[in-house]
């Protein structure tokens, strides 16, 4: 009993680690069955049960929508649905296949935003939740947080690895920033590059919708999270338009790889294991190297070598956007993103200092979870 208490108090020191990802649809409050007025008809009860089921299993509605869209594609393979499922603008005669850019890419992003909504909810509720219960995470609020962070860790592990693979196929490996401009403008990309970029965009669109609809209880750093998501979406959209996708790939990798260790640290914290200490140290070093050192290197390339390597002028007809306007816009957004990351780094270092030097386990973000647990208990008592 004493060992469990000690281990719990040790790991709870890391509860305040900031979270970069938004919540999930499963964090929406589900109205208790007993509080609903029961319909007397069989059809009414069936409809009522279906609604309740869809709120408890929040992956059902996205799955139905995906099934309908894919089914419609098989009915009409040449319809607009194909632009959501497959990459658009293939360049004939290219090997490996190259793809251009255009407005139809928005359909691809929206379809996979819906796909991620299903995947996220299904994996969290049907797989990760069982893992959490195996590690004795019983409080519903903490279990939901564990599900979110475990899914985030899984997603960024896949995407971070994919991003590094894509970068390895280009001259900018490993963060050779001069390559940003040597072959600019980048009108076309191989399928793996374009798919990676648009799927990342789809993920952040889905995350933004969760925040906009406020499908989870806002945390203490909600405003910073909103600013982070706005900057991220602006960088994705403008980099795609300006043909700065090589810069975007580099930034994606720095963010994704650091988020792996961030989410892993939070997962281990919920599991209550001392392994969280070395993982947290690794996380801090990866965060500083990826989100600060490498991003400052990217920012320097935008400020400096962008002007000195190849032409530096605006030509709308040739879609040559490497000029002072795009430079300043990109630099402002990267600087804003860096300021948010510095703010989070300060929080992270403060948490680490308290965890390793004191017994102070107080943090503001944990109060959110405690309030959720308290609310759930109060609600349960009222329904009894």
UniProtKB/Swiss-Prot annotation:
GO terms for cellular component: endoplasmic reticulum; endoplasmic reticulum membrane. The keyword Membrane applies. Its main location: endoplasmic reticulum. Coiled coil: none annotated. Belongs to the sphingosine N-acyltransferase family. It is an enzyme of class 2 (transferase). Residues 1-58, 125-154, 216-232, 291-328 are cytoplasmic. This is Sphingosine N-acyltransferase lac1. GO terms for biological process: ceramide biosynthetic process; meiotic cell cycle. The lineage of its organism: Eukaryota, Fungi, Dikarya, Ascomycota, Taphrinomycotina. One of its GO terms (molecular function) is sphingosine N-acyltransferase activity. It comes from Schizosaccharomyces pombe (strain 972 / ATCC 24843). It is found in: Endoplasmic reticulum membrane. The gene is lac1. Residues 19-29 have a biased composition (Polar residues).
């Amino acid at each position: 009993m004493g060992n469990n208490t000690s281990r719990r108090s040790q790991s709870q020191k890391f509860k305040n680690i900031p979270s970069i990802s938004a919540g999930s649809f499963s964090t929406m409050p589900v109205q208790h069955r007993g509080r609903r007025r029961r319909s007397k008809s069989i059809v009414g009860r069936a409809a009522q049960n279906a609604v309740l089921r869809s709120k408890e299993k929040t992956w059902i509605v996205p799955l139905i929508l995906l099934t309908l869209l894919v089914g419609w594609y098989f009915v009409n393979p040449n319809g607009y649905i194909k632009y959501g499922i497959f990459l658009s603008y293939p360049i004939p005669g290219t090997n490996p296949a190259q793809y251009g850019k255009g407005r139809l890419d928005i359909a691809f992003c929206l379809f996979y935003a819906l796909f991620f909504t299903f995947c996220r909810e299904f994996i969290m509720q049907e797989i990760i939740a069982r893992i959490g219960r195996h590690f004795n995470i019983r409080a519903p609020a903490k279990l939901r947080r564990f599900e979110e962070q475990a899914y985030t860790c899984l997603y960024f592990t896949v995407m971070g690895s994919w991003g590094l693979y894509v970068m390895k196929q280009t001259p900018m490996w490993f963060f050779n920033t001069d390559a940003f401009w040597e072959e600019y403008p980048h009108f076309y990309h191989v399928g793996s590059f374009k798919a990676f970029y648009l799927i990342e965009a789809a993920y952040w669109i889905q995350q933004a919708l969760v925040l906009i609809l406020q499908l989870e209880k806002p945390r203490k750093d909600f405003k910073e999270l909103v600013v982070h998501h706005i900057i991220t979406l602006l960088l994705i959209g403008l980099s795609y338009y300006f043909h700065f996708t090589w810069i975007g790939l580099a930034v994606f990798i720095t963010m994704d790889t650091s988020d792996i260790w961030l989410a892993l640290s939070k997962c281990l914290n919920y599991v209550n294991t001392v392994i969280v200490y070395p993982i947290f140290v690794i996380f801090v070093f990866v965060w500083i190297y990826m989100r600060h050192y490498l991003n400052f290197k990217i920012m320097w390339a935008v400020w400096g070598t962008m002007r000195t390597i190849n032409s530096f002028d605006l030509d709308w007809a040739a879609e040559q956007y490497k000029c002072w306007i795009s430079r300043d816009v990109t630099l402002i957004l990267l600087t804003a993103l860096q300021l948010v990351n510095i703010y989070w780094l300060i929080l992270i270092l403060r948490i680490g200092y308290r965890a390793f030097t004191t017994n102070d386990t107080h943090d503001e973000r944990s109060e959110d979870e405690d309030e959720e647990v308290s609310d759930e208990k109060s609600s349960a008592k009222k329904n009894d």
